[in-house]
Swiss-Prot record:
Name the record gives this protein: Methionine--tRNA ligase
Described function: Is required not only for elongation of protein synthesis but also for the initiation of all mRNA translation through initiator tRNA(fMet) aminoacylation.
Motif 'KMSKS' region mapped to chain: 334-338
Keyword Isomerase: no
Catalytic reaction list: tRNA(Met) + L-methionine + ATP = L-methionyl-tRNA(Met) + AMP + diphosphate
Known EC number: 6.1.1.10
A GO biological-process term: methionyl-tRNA aminoacylation
Amino acid sequence: MIGIKILVNCALPYANGPLHVGHIAGAYLGADVFVRFNRLIGNEVLYVSGSDEYGTPITVRAEKEGKSPQEIADRYYAEHIETFKKLGINFDIFMRTTYPEHSSVAQEFFLKLLNEGVIEKGTMIAPYCRKIGRFMPDRYIEGECPYCGYKKARGDQCDNCGRTLDPQELINPVCILSGETPEFRETEHFFLRLDLFEERLEEWLKTKTFWKPNVLAYTRNFIQGGLKKRAITRDIDWGVKVPLEGYEHKRIYVWFEALIGYITGAKMFSEVIGKPNYWKEFYFDKDVKNYYFIGKDNIPFHSIIWPAMLLGYGELNLPYDIPANEYLTFKGEQFSKSRGIGYTVDELLRVIPPDYLRYYVASILPETGDSDFSLEELVKTVNSDLIDKYGNFVHRTLSFINKYDLKITKPNSLNDEAFEYAQNAFKEYCDELSQVHIKRSLAIWLNLAIYANSYFNKSEPWNLIKTDRDQCNYKLYVSLKLAQYLTAMIYPFTPTSAKAIWEQLGVNMDIDSSFSILNSINDFSVKPSRIPFEKLDIDKLKL
């Protein structure tokens, strides 16, 4: 795997509210860990996301607040950028779908599919609110989900079961602005012919035996139900304009154009670095692996609609993997910024360090099933794993060396069981992370931390310093190697604290290159120990 190109696309968050912890667990933290890991092993990564700023999620918020959609988008774009920055998540580019560059890319994509016969005109029945006097697409309509019975399902999707919906499927639908029952009227729109790609998508899915079972099952079930053409335009003012004469009042559906935002982002980054065709290396080179990190509710858009769009366009790479996570819950309920359930990221970062949040969320990622977030468990996990096991081991090792002012010299060879254990743990860790198994890789790291503490205790350097200086030097060198492995391996998860500890180990190499020397015998020039961890007290966390 080493030395290949990797494209990592992260779901574009809607710019209609603050980021909550469920968002981070759903897509962004796993992607960031994966990107950092791939760069550590020498892969070339393009890391793309952006701000999803069109469509009804934005206009609904704007109308409720008496603001313009652009004002809402501007506010939350800036807020999201700052939240990601505080959390240590740094995309190569974070584009905005309201950029003119994106409109151009989306319109070109639309026209290409239209010319290829993949998009066609047709009519559909859409909700119309007589009281307000206009069509009310998608999130302007709420009602009961016909599949799971959730009472607050939206006209485009059910937040509870993840099903994509049409407004007329809802039981007892109402307009969220007027409270009135909408009437359904005929309106002309453009449709994506998903049915044209059913067989090709089924064949493609047969090659995805390594996908998460939940993603594969969801996608197969969706296809087995029969793919139908899907409307990709809306009667709305806020969005990318349909680039055809006579249809200037129509807008391209947000979920169609937002997916194209991945390509927009790659193109814009290519312009920024002065290599306009760089993006093509990630979309046309068949050796490149494209990963899409998303939440459960976005699975059908990325595993069916987007691949169909790519097939329709022609020659563009299909997703290699879609490691979608399930939901993060709070006291058994799904995190929701619209319903005020759970914490926003900014709320938590006001009382705990970013690395603490990153570590805990990584340890409970809902990779194959829902996970529940608990502040009490966060405190216990951080105190136990990061501080009592990892931090304590490193501090004891460095403090002992500094206490006796020792200059630890490297041995000619390392024929030590502990070194072999660390090498094997590192290999397993890399194997798991290469497959986007975030929690498994973290569990391997934690087992190594437990082993390292045991090794230090059994070595008894406090006795060896008196009886056998050479053996004491050797045991402390092995302890430093264990600390080095642990620090490099935790770096993708807790980058700020890992970097601080790496510098205290006194390795003559930046931590971003750390993986290249782990299995070798290197020098250490130990600095004073200042472990960047403090225990959390649940009673002092005021939220």
